[in-house]
């Protein structure tokens, strides 16, 4: 018995569990003694039984409200009557039916929900509702994949062409205004050639 105790003490005091020390312990005792050590990351987790993924509060469900209390049986009934109806459509129908109920018809379900909430507060006094963050949806025109170099080059060329056409249009328009500003004003005494020339420039 003394040799077993000294062997166990040397094992827990050493950082590496050497095979020589483990051989001094019987097989059935060694398996039961090291079961917790091998499965847990630390002695604290083995003693307390806590899970590293989260506390118990993260797994606690919210207390049901009046609508959920009412819709439990109604949803089951509607699903049995309409086996091909989708769950989303059932939810829409239940929401519409709930709105059509009077306050007197809703009141028993509000009372039941208040009782459930009181029981929930008593059972989980430190409970706080933490809604899950929804993943941000990317816009339809936004993509994480890199754009094709050929398409980028093509779009740049098209943009340059548009800018070039706009610049040419502005330059032509300003040049025409400049030329029209130097034309003599047309009047009734002007010759037919002058009137034709003026109409030609104004049509451009």
Swiss-Prot record:
Residues 194-204 have a biased composition (Basic and acidic residues). It is found in: Nucleus speckle; Cytoplasm; Nucleus. InterPro entries: HMG_box_dom (IPR009071), HMG_box_dom_sf (IPR036910), SRY (IPR017253), SRY-related_HMG-box_TF-like (IPR050140). Keywords: Acetylation, Activator, Calmodulin-binding, Cytoplasm, Differentiation, DNA-binding, Nucleus, Repressor, Sexual differentiation, Transcription, Transcription regulation. Interacts with CALM, EP300, HDAC3, KPNB1, ZNF208 isoform KRAB-O, PARP1, SLC9A3R2 and WT1. The interaction with EP300 modulates its DNA-binding activity. The interaction with KPNB1 is sensitive to dissociation by Ran in the GTP-bound form. Interaction with PARP1 impaired its DNA-binding activity. Transcriptional regulator that controls a genetic switch in male development. It is necessary and sufficient for initiating male sex determination by directing the development of supporting cell precursors (pre-Sertoli cells) as Sertoli rather than granulosa cells. Involved in different aspects of gene regulation including promoter activation or repression. Binds to the DNA consensus sequence 5'-[AT]AACAA[AT]-3'. SRY HMG box recognizes DNA by partial intercalation in the minor groove and promotes DNA bending. Also involved in pre-mRNA splicing. This is Sex-determining region Y protein.
């Amino acid at each position: 018995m003394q040799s077993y105790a000294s062997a166990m003490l040397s094992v827990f005091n050493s950082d590496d569990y050497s095979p020589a020390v483990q051989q001094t312990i019987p097989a059935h005792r060694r398996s039961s003694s090291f079961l917790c050590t091998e499965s847990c990351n630390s002695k604290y987790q083995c003693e307390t039984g806590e899970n590293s993924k989260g506390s118990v509060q993260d797994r606690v469900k919210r207390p049901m409200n009046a609508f959920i209390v009412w819709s439990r049986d109604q949803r089951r009934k509607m699903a049995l009557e309409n086996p091909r109806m989708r769950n989303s459509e059932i939810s829409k129908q239940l929401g519409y039916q709930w709105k059509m109920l009077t306050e007197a018809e809703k009141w028993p379900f509000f009372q039941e929900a208040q009782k459930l909430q009181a029981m929930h507060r008593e059972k989980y006094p430190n409970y706080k509702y933490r809604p899950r963050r929804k993943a941000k949806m990317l816009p339809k025109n936004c993509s994480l994949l890199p754009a094709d170099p050929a398409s980028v080059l093509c779009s740049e060329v098209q943009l340059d062409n548009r800018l070039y056409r706009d610049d040419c249009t502005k330059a032509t328009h300003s040049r025409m205004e400049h030329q029209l500003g130097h034309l003599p004003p047309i009047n009734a005494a002007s010759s037919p050639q002058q009137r034709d020339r003026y109409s030609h420039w104004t049509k451009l």
